[in-house]
Amino acid sequence: MKDHYTLRGVILDPNASKKIFTSPQRNTGWVVDMFQVWPYNMDANLYTAGKLWKGDVAQASFQNSDAWHSQAIAWSTFSGATAEAVGVNIIDPDHVITTELHVVNMSAQACSYIVHLRRVHLDDDQEIMSLLKERQQDV
């Protein structure tokens, strides 16, 4: 099994989500090292925003950053409206993906994304704690 994955693609629908990764085995977790979004059509769109969401995406909001929600683990924006393009990329350093990962497009247009995942080994206790946190339960 690989120790890292690079996932990249496009979400064509505005305010939509896409499952981009499913963890293949028990006692294996995945950590996001890098996440960035940018407009799918750089000529027509000057702004885009996205976030990474682990586990069930049904609770994900497409309109805000959800920094309070433990399933939201990374946020990225891109704006080309100024002379120099600017972006903000934030990754929660205390997260482990144990089931699945979704990218959420919070923009009114299509967005491109790239994510780098690194594999980590989990003992049984760590896996249970990660699953509880992923399901938004108190730990």
Task: List each language-model region with its residue ranges.
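Beta-strand-centric surfaces of beta-sandwich/beta-rich domains
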Residues: 1-31, 36-139
